[in-house]
Amino acid sequence: MSNEGTNTVLKNPGSNQEEADPDSPSSLGDKSKLDELADSTSDGSQANSGRGIAFWAIFISLSVTGFLSSMEGGIMSTALPAVSRAVNAESDYVWIINVYFLTSAAFQPLYGQLADIWGRRWPMLSAVTIFAAGSAICGAANNSGTLIGGRAIQGLGAAGINTLVELILCDLLPLRERGQFMGLLFLFIVVGSVLGPMLGGIIVDKTSWRWIFFINLPICALCFGLLFFALNLKHRRDDNSTSLQKLKKIDFVGVLILCVAVTLLIYALTYGGGAKYAWSHPVIITTLVLGIFGHGLFIAFEASPWCSNPTTPLTLFQNRTSVAAYTLEAVQILVSWGALYFLPLYFQSVLALTPSRSGVLILAFSISYCLSAAIGGGLVTKLGKYRLVHIISFAIMTIMMGVFTILNRNSSLAVNVILGLIAGVGVGLPNASILTAVQASLPDSLNAASTALFAFIRSLATVFAVTIPAAIFNSRFDDLLSTSALDNDVKNSLDLGKAYQQASPDFLHSFPAPVQDQIVGLYELSLKLVWQVLIGIAAVGVIASLLEKDLECRTEQTTEEFGLKDRDEKAPKKSEV
């Protein structure tokens, strides 16, 4: 058994003093309480084998809520053209998507803090209510400004949902058992992500686009009802504080800095490298630099004496295991979403498959991804270890991105299906256990802050996962296009980022065979560079997983502040809400 368990204490050679392992939660939290768990967590014998009705009621309500948020995240992908035309969005159409990601990312750390101050129940119910209000505004919108405003409110609600669903599950389960339930929760989220685009297309074709948003209202009502009755959770932190005292503890300045920084970054990534601005344009350079500086300023403020109650305490970064695990989450999102967006581009531009056939092929990757996440979470629960799972997973990712570089127009459909299945295993296996690695080195009292930061990194990485490969692809394609022998009319239809939009068999078949061959060759070479960049990103994941310590997964909670309320506990007083 490794000596790097939750209660590890390292002795300094040549000294009688004991030095706490910085990766051990006992060095960061309640040491005496954690030390009492040393023997009980070593063999996992105290892991609970069964769960009561109260737990399953909460788990089902969280799963339905997670399904709702993930479905909304994808439903606009197929409906955006129709919605944009209906509200005359014109060039503002991109913000119908991006403002949702902006607010859902920027406010996640705030929800973690609110959950610590007010408990989990009311922030969660508020998030569902805000999401429903945003959906209603979007559905009733008659212009792009109202629609974008509604989407911003939707994202504000989604920020709470995405953070608190995982956080509440962490409160209910000891560390060792979280992986398998996170895997099950992920199944609901993936189903929502898969159904979202399909449902968006059906609604636009068969009914009014407004039902893309109005359909959320009955689901929100169901979620609110389930959560209202199921979330019978305790909260014993600051019970005697008044509402005004609690408000004063919110890190408003930090949240404002983060919102501005995220907005600047997303603006630069949205407009850079397109028809409006080149990457070298002063506007893009300025917003990008200010966005990066803003994130640095946010970290500096959180560590400063002016921030007495930070949304993101630097304690989260004071050991290598949590830092490595946060890095793994960013890498996993960058690689998985990069593959999810650019494999269909390969299918449609190089293999000249229709969007429907492309969708069928990508199912191999998606299904493997989904099932592997559940299996990976179960493995970590069974073994009580996560490091080996992560090393194997990120090694598979790196190898598969390398294999993708040799894909070309002659690759068979069977080969593509098999490669998709293997790649799905690589990106799926670690999905439900990376948060476990983060929290293995931290006390359970930091669950809210660590989960909120985890969700924020995931959301921001999702934006980068599309924009970074797209910028690389467009830049490479434009360079190759400028030196090709294609005539100017063909070049004008493909330059300045239009190659991604034109990736379809209909576009290819509109040209003579020799021209088709040249265009396909440009796509092959441009995609090859994307896969090569993803190789490097995945390799960072291998290095980060090697830097992790394989800390013991605790089989008992180390805090009694949160979790299921005991039967004999009274309902909270109004002052506690």
Curated annotation (Swiss-Prot):
GO terms for molecular function: transmembrane transporter activity. Residues 1-47, 558-577 are annotated as: Disordered. Induction: Expressed exclusively during fungal penetration of host leaves, the time point at which plant defense reactions are triggered. One of its GO terms (cellular component) is plasma membrane. Belongs to the major facilitator superfamily. It is a multi-pass membrane protein. This is MFS-type efflux transporter MFS1. Glycans are attached at N240, N319, N410. The chain crosses the membrane at residues 52-72, 94-114, 122-142, 155-175, 184-204, 211-231, 252-272, 283-303, 333-353, 360-380, 388-408, 417-437, 453-473, 527-547. MFS-type efflux transporter; part of the gene cluster that mediates the biosynthesis of a tyrosine-derived cytochalasan acting as a fungal signal recognized by resistant rice plants and leads to avirulence in Pi33 resistant rice cultivars. MFS1 might be involved in the excretion of the signaling tyrosine-derived cytochalasan. The gene is MFS1. It comes from the Eukaryota. It is found in: Cell membrane. Residues 1-17 have a biased composition (Polar residues). Keywords: Cell membrane, Glycoprotein, Membrane, Transmembrane, Transmembrane helix, Transport. Pfam families: MFS_1. InterPro entries: MFS (IPR011701), MFS_dom (IPR020846), MFS_trans_sf (IPR036259).
